[in-house]
Amino acid sequence: MKVEAKKKFGQNFISDQNLINKIVSILGNDKDQLIIEIGPGTGALTKLLAQKYNKVVAIEIDTDMEPILKKEITNDNFELFLSDVLLVDFEKLIKEKRQHENQKVSIISNMPYYITSEILFRTLNVSDKLTKAVFMMQKEVAIRVCSYKGENNYNNLSVACEFYADKKYEFTVPKHMFYPVPKVDSAIISLTFNNKYTEQIKDKDKFLTFLRKIFNNRRKTILNNLSNVTNDKTKANEILDNLNIDKSLRPEVVGLEDFIRIYNKTR
């Protein structure tokens, strides 16, 4: 069913069934999952999700989509939540909708470009409750998210996602696969959450703030950026000397494990 997309909500719809199957397959074959879909639109992904998994909760800001979704998806295991996703308390939602405490929870979204970072960070904030996230986003941002140290697009978002999850660039989605056709290609990424690094940091929000500040000026050295974090160049010097980290390095060539070591020394 074709509907008019609303630019203010960043709507770009997909309808190709092969693409839909390929995206949903990334969530795996474990039927006993609570799937939270952000921005279901006309329900292209939602319909298959409701067939494949035990519980699907879709969050949609556009109230005009309600009659379309309710007509297209009549499964008892589907629930529509009309809200701006940035106002949703994910922790509360998961607690209320999870059918039992051992049920896996995953998030999937064809993300509006204009709130990609906000959705990503809100997802990371509840990563301890999640098994996986599958996101479609602007290709340029997907490359950034999935970059590692030494790569051109590596930034604080790359490090933050690596901190919480095993990240994977799944595949590119050409712009002609959408209607209306956007200006750029998209890509699918997956985040498989783990606690490999998270237990090394007590206050994760402060660590994410630290990463933003460290990458605030990419042209500056790790010493200069750390000095701005600590407001004390002498202390920054001491931290890097103590950890035997080259002070002339720029943030984009410093890895996650070293950022964790540096951060813990600032506490």
Swiss-Prot record:
Where it mainly occurs, coarsely classed, is cytoplasm
Q: What does this protein do?
A: Specifically dimethylates two adjacent adenosines (A1518 and A1519) in the loop of a conserved hairpin near the 3'-end of 16S rRNA in the 30S particle. May play a critical role in biogenesis of 30S subunits.
Positions of S-adenosyl-L-methionine binding: 12, 14, 39, 60, 84, 110
* Pfam families given in the database record: RrnaAD
Family, according to the entry, reads as follows: Belongs to the class I-like SAM-binding methyltransferase superfamily. rRNA adenine N(6)-methyltransferase family. RsmA subfamily.
Instruction: Write down the EC number.
Output: 2.1.1.182
The question of whether rRNA processing is a record keyword is answered with yes
Record-linked PROSITE patterns = RRNA_A_DIMETH, SAM_RNA_A_N6_MT
Q: What is this protein called?
A: Ribosomal RNA small subunit methyltransferase A
User: InterPro entries recorded for this chain?
Assistant: KsgA/Erm, rRNA_Ade_diMease-like_C, rRNA_Ade_Mease_Trfase_CS, rRNA_Ade_methylase_Trfase_N, rRNA_adenine_dimethylase, SAM-dependent_MTases_sf
Superkingdom assignment:
Bacteria
Q: Which GO terms describe its molecular function?
A: 16S rRNA (adenine(1518)-N(6)/adenine(1519)-N(6))-dimethyltransferase activity; RNA binding
Q: Which GO terms describe its cellular component?
A: cytosol
Q: Is Electron transport among this UniProt entry's keywords? A: no
- What UniProt keywords apply to this chain's record, in alphabetical order? Cytoplasm, Methyltransferase, RNA-binding, rRNA processing, S-adenosyl-L-methionine, Transferase
Catalytic activity annotation: adenosine(1518)/adenosine(1519) in 16S rRNA + 4 S-adenosyl-L-methionine = N(6)-dimethyladenosine(1518)/N(6)-dimethyladenosine(1519) in 16S rRNA + 4 S-adenosyl-L-homocysteine + 4 H(+)
Compartment(s):
Cytoplasm
